């Protein structure tokens, strides 16, 4: 058995993949080398791609043996055999969905070279499992040895990992909402919800980077598992040399990689490509099962399987498959009950196309196929497209049982592309490793199947890519929205057809492309998308600089601005009749910068207020049909596995922003509800002051078996709370999306499952981090050594120099600390640290610097200035912080208008705004001359030693110096409020000539002008 070859020379071979093994060494074609960096991350070299795949499987078995065993059991539906009764629900679903059978089918249809490559990976897994299991204490805990992997096992792992990824159980929730609240409320709760997984990703062209080459960065958001769902790895052979984030159990690098020539990343497209069909089933006299299809009753495939349960009796599950797909809910015995036999069944018998009218289908957009009518026409003549397996094919069987209803019992089947087509997209994986350009990558992705992703990519030759990849079937739009009747041919898939996949210009004129699961490129393919806040915020942050570097990307990864707080805080601002404590709470939250920072007690207060509002909404009569005793979560009609999608309180929490703005409740009721919550939260805060957000907002990862108490050998301080469940910043709709369940818990299980920065200038300047470490073995030095870095947003370097790596198949014993430059990121934006657009020393006053306004970082400062009584002529005295921020975001978006802070010796002293009069409403009030240049001034109060004589005139000297340093500017225009006598007198004193009064919508102003000649005379 060939395992690995330890290198005798750490620096042997070149850095590129073309010299993976030195020419003067004779090595077996099966041989490989395992190197590790200081973080235990494996770097693998082999003589060819097959040996490299074997190496990848082998090292994954060493590092993640228990994780691989867990995944193998999950795809087979045998988890309960070692984890007990709590795993039965999953096992039952996997058996009924026939995931293992689908994996076998898809493996059988792989290209021969791909099948050999996957087989080599499996050989490596089997080679390494015994040693890996000897290191992993979990095997002893459950008294099991690892099971052997089959060639098709990786495909099954991929299926089981992603089968719930597209969120088909949400269709069950929509049916419940339609039945209980009405058809027009079906999409009331539409938003990024309990079962979805998303990501951030962004691409910067060279015009926005310090190196002049593209940067690609982001972070996938998934349920965080320990060990992690991503594995940092490097794969090198003569054909390629790739770094990236692999999925343990899957060969190659599917989602995030850098080949040296091209880098790519993905986010969930939020597409809908899995359908649920309402089936009618009946038992035959010989014990078989019949299903009702478009052509009448026919014999369906049916067999039974046994689920072994540790510590309990085994269970028997009946596996049924119709022409649509495997039955996952209900059966011929009627166990689905009233949920589909009663009113809901009646709703499904009606005109489903009507769900697209009257607003409930507004999220579907222009779906492929030319609307539901075109899809209906196309589907009616097509066959079902599935291969339900043995026992199908229309055999009438033994006829209906005398005790069975002639109409049949209700059930639900699942139809998804791999089961129908026998393709899972694994032929793409080796092609990704060999890609050298965006064109190579694009061609490979044409064969991608699932999950359906949005892809960003860039190469070193200047190419870029922004597209959707995956298989979305062509069928009626309504299939995406709800459960549809199996016997009606109108709802069939168009056999052999796939929806066209959108693509767009990779990088726009601003040099920025963003993907964050929003309703954007993939809008025609889905129903529910993430709110736009993350995408907007990322664009805002990236647009603020043109010198981005890999290290600076962490500033974006860790941004905590919570834009979705606006509706709730707006209602709080106007909540009537608050008591003193609630007034103090309101004042505090309205002054809050809306950043969910770990050290913020205001963030905690906001979270408490949000939770209380969620529960009050859940108790409101408007939602009583889906809450309390009527909560679909309590229904016995559906398997317990689907309860996260059916629980009302989390649905309300995730959709709170829209529920507080749509017409669900009258405005007065919303105000009263928020006022009541404010009183309750304020009273609690008076009694128990809030803790910092990071003390409550802790990671709660999923683990098949909990860790043993830490003794500090894993690199932690011995504290399980901090080593396993660190407190971090962020929230559901922040760029730093650490998502708890609003209204249920502040703990979070979904968040950045990795972070990456791919540098197209120098791959060795790329960076990455995962929540835990390279090793899944408790007690290893690299089990959780990246957790502190991940928690604070730091990244570790991607090492590409073989000479800096450790040639071993074992983890290095020591983990040297990172340098400060490697482990820290830039702090918050401080005005004094920003690059100045103008700097001028004013004699007797100090140095005046003009720096751009950062609307988010400066909002407290600006709001404080513009709402003071002395600034009443500025016209923003009653504005909220959010309104002030939005105004200056808008100003910053205009090429003709700019806002600056004037700093006197580093201290903010004034707000200085400039504009081009012919691009401003003031230009309509007078005859604009060539060279006119408008300014607005708001001087901050000077206190203490700063209150020197001539303070304002000194600042004006610097402002005028800035304006007239451009020879194209011939005249300064100001327009103070006509009532502001002090400002007018000041302008005259420094040389302005008064012009006429003008009437603007917000004020009557007096124009004043300062020519270049007059300014020179003053100088």
Residue ranges and their predicted role:
Residues 931, 1000-1019:
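C-terminal "cap" of GNAT-fold acetyltransferases
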Residues 916-918, 975, 993-1007:
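Conserved catalytic-core motifs of GNAT/GCN5-like acyltransferases
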Residues 973-984, 1001:
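Conserved beta-strand-loop-alpha-helix junction that forms the acyl-donor binding cleft
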Residues 2-342, 346, 350, 377, ...:
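C-terminal/peripheral segments of proteins
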